[in-house]
Amino acid sequence: MIKAILTDIEGTTSSINYVKDVMFGYSKKRLKDYLQTHWEEEHVKNIVKSLSQKLEKNIDLQTAVLVFKDFIEKDIKDTLLKELQGHIWEEGFKSGELKGHIYEDAYIKLKELKEKGYKIFAYSSGSIKAQKLFFGYSVYGDITNFFDGFFDTTMGSKKDKNSYIKIASATEIDPQMFLFLSDVKEEINASKEAGMNAILVSRDRPCEEKDCIRDFTEINL
């Protein structure tokens, strides 16, 4: 019996192109100005200090900009980059320059499932801060109340079964009572290895898997 939904964001509830092109493009464009403006503030100092330790060398403003831009261009899932992007996106969302994209079918189904009493959690490579901003300033307004919790890669890789075991443990819900939704096969496989039910969301490609849907309207619980 399913009691909880665990959903990916990028490519699942939301357009992968919006995240990659609009949000990543915005963080890359604003990166230098943001670091320059907030260089002496504690949160940026901590990020730069951690980056220095990671690369084993002193990091000045110019180097920090180059390193983080390189991470963005190569789509490196770096925790420090995610933290920095969260701060940059916060300014963008609060100013109205950014609005979190949600597919209409995902919005309607998540709302319906919440009203039926299902627990709903998000799991993304984006930081928890970024997830809350994304859903807090979405095209449908603030929908963070749909969610009972948010998880990011501090739980581990989304392709590692242990991450899903940790999430189940953190929520105190048996893995067998979860339905995981993602557009990435390796993530689906990892969640199944952890004991979860899982469905591949294949919005842009024909479904070739048994447990596969084109959009959220096909979820029947």
UniProtKB/Swiss-Prot annotation:
Details of cofactor binding: Binds 1 Mg(2+) ion per subunit.
EC number: 3.1.3.77
GO molecular function: 2,3-diketo-5-methylthiopentyl-1-phosphate enolase activity; 2-hydroxy-3-keto-5-methylthiopentenyl-1-phosphate phosphatase activity; acireductone synthase activity; magnesium ion binding
Enzyme class (EC, first level): hydrolase
Pathway: Amino-acid biosynthesis; L-methionine biosynthesis via salvage pathway; L-methionine from S-methyl-5-thio-alpha-D-ribose 1-phosphate: step 3/6; Amino-acid biosynthesis; L-methionine biosynthesis via salvage pathway; L-methionine from S-methyl-5-thio-alpha-D-ribose 1-phosphate: step 4/6
Superkingdom per UniProt: Bacteria
Pfam families per UniProt: Hydrolase
Stretches of the chain forming a coiled coil according to its record: none
Ribosomal protein found in the keyword field: no
Catalyzed chemical reaction(s): 5-methylsulfanyl-2,3-dioxopentyl phosphate + H2O = 1,2-dihydroxy-5-(methylsulfanyl)pent-1-en-3-one + phosphate
UniProt cofactor(s): Mg(2+)
InterPro entries the UniProt entry points to: Enolase-ppase_E1 (IPR023943), HAD-like_sf (IPR036412), HAD-SF_hydro_IA (IPR006439), HAD_sf (IPR023214)
Keywords for the protein's UniProt record, in alphabetical order: Amino-acid biosynthesis, Hydrolase, Magnesium, Metal-binding, Methionine biosynthesis
GO biological process: L-methionine salvage from methylthioadenosine
Function: Bifunctional enzyme that catalyzes the enolization of 2,3-diketo-5-methylthiopentyl-1-phosphate (DK-MTP-1-P) into the intermediate 2-hydroxy-3-keto-5-methylthiopentenyl-1-phosphate (HK-MTPenyl-1-P), which is then dephosphorylated to form the acireductone 1,2-dihydroxy-3-keto-5-methylthiopentene (DHK-MTPene).
Family affiliation: Belongs to the HAD-like hydrolase superfamily. MasA/MtnC family.
Quaternary assembly: Monomer.
NCBIfam families from the UniProt entry: enolase-ppase (TIGR01691), HAD-SF-IA-v1 (TIGR01549)
Protein name stated in the entry: Enolase-phosphatase E1
Lineage: Bacteria, Pseudomonadati, Aquificota, Aquificia, Aquificales
